[in-house]
Amino acid sequence: MREHNLKNIIHLMLVCVLLGCSQTDSTSNQNIDFAANAEKLVLNEFQPSTLSKEEQTKELAWFTKTAEPFRGMTINVVSETLTTHEYESEVLTEAFFEITGIKVNHDLIQEGDVIEKLQTQMQTGQNVYDAYVNDSDLIGTHSRYGYVVALSDFMENEGSAFTLPTLDLEDFIGISFTTGPDGKIYQLPDQQFANLYWFRYDWFNDSQLKKQFEEIYGYPLGVPINWSAYQDIAEFFTKEVKEIDGQPVYGHMDYGKKDPSLGWRFTDAWLSMAGAGDKGIPNGLPVDEWGIRVEGCRPVGSSVSRGGATNSPAAVYALQKYIDWLKNYAPAEASGMTFSEAGPVPAQGQIAQQIFWYTTFTADMIKEGLPVVNEDGTPKWRMVPSPHGPYWSEGMKLGYQDTGAWTLLKSTPLERRQAAWLYAQFVVSKTVSLKKTLVGLTPIRDSDIRSEAMTNLAPRLGGLVEFYRSPARTAWTPTGTNVPDYPKLAQLWWANVANAVSGEQTAQTAMNQLAEQQDRVLERLATHGVQGDCGPQLNERSDPEYWFNQEGAPKPKLADENPKGKTVPYDELIQSWQNQ
């Protein structure tokens, strides 16, 4: 994730907002040849595409015609600073103006600031932005509070005339992530990236290293299927190999500084990877990866004593393993790093594997001249599905996938909401989406993933295309609907995790405290009664043994949390997907 100096642009946007200028010079629009502009864009910008050039031209003509009531308007939208959104802000806003006459100020700010602006508009009713690209992690929040427009309703009613006939919602791989407990779609996916396992393919195929590993551990060096194998491989490179080509090497990389990013290191599905929740895709039911249990659609508790799993043996195991691996196998400085500081480290060439690696780093990991890139431009590394802990079983989610999605608020005036809806659809339309995917590597459409262009690019992307085409993809999902207020609950995680990392508290004490704090938030939401029929309603406390004796989560402590390691050769794994 890169930050650009946008002060001048943002200053002009703010001046416009403060002065209330919502119109461009209408006479300038009269001189625009929308059809000619569309033709140029199809030829010069929006290639490749899964649509024919004729189909692209027809789709853009629909935008031109449908935008007529809003021609000359200026709308304001916002997203976090990702390469994908930079392309939208710098290129697609201009393209949209050229075919519609609608000017779009697409602001780029930090993710936390996006949520802050969103909350400000919700709480005050003042229109801060006309549309937001907001993480679908907030789906449980949006579907309960009533501030966000249910797009399913909007597309059938006041947004019907402005909904793209070729939008093809079924083509969006993340549409289930933006669907509430009521079955309604609340957000339109704009970009997605997963959190996967990353490893040095070249080292794992080194004959001497393979021989040495098998002699020590009794099974082949390969892609770890379970956490036991991950730990063995981490130990092998850090404690046994120690050095390659004169450089120290490590079998693990992570970060551990007391910082908000330590929170999403866990809420981005670490507990589900260990197996703390229940079966269910996109999220465990009745208990999800935050350890929150729901009955029907009502959250009823986080603590084991209320039927939750936030302080369950599986959750404590997940936290303890994170701490042990960070301290025993990662570079010493990793404990003092934040997410953004640790992100570039694997590209420096001294890390053998990383269990928690975001695919947004792909573009920065394939640059020429890096120690992890071959001379022909292909990567020395690969990404694959993450290994799972001993509490995990088939049918559970296995990892996290971030989905930034277009979100409309009811407090936005209807006309501005309709115009913003046009822009949101434009930047995810089939005319645009494949080119945008190639720029930002954050795919949202199945048709794009299976395109010839992605096939051609696949060898340079280290397994990204193979993962998104695989049946395994469905087990990587965002935070789900069990979380009724993402901002309030997410902020609890990092401080509690940090207490365990520092040694100030045990893993069990830290998770007990977190579970108790989550329950207090749920209790306050229940007391206020603002979330309707799907708002929290806490269970009474029971003996934890009662819940351990029930089927599913919370699960009792296993007698053996470290079964024998299992691995699979990377090429064999890829072949098995292709045969399905």
Q: Where in this protein do the model-derived segments appear?
A:
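Hinge/lid segment of periplasmic solute-binding proteins
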Residues: 32-69, 136-196, 380-386, 557-580
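Extracytoplasmic "Venus flytrap"
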Residues: 52, 72-91, 193
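Short, polar/charged alpha-helical segment
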Residues: 60-66, 83-103, 198, 202, ...
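Long, aromatic- and glycine/proline-rich binding clefts that accommodate carbohydrate-like moieties
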Residues: 60-62, 74, 379-388, 437-501, ...
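Extracytoplasmic "Venus flytrap"/periplasmic binding protein-like
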Residues: 94-171, 206-208, 212-214, 345, ...
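Periplasmic solute-binding protein
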Residues: 136-156, 172-219, 231, 254-303, ...
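Extracytoplasmic/periplasmic substrate-recognition and gating elements
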Residues: 179, 327-332, 341, 351, ...
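Glycine-centered hinge/linker elements that transmit conformational signals in sensory
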Residues: 229-235, 272-336, 386
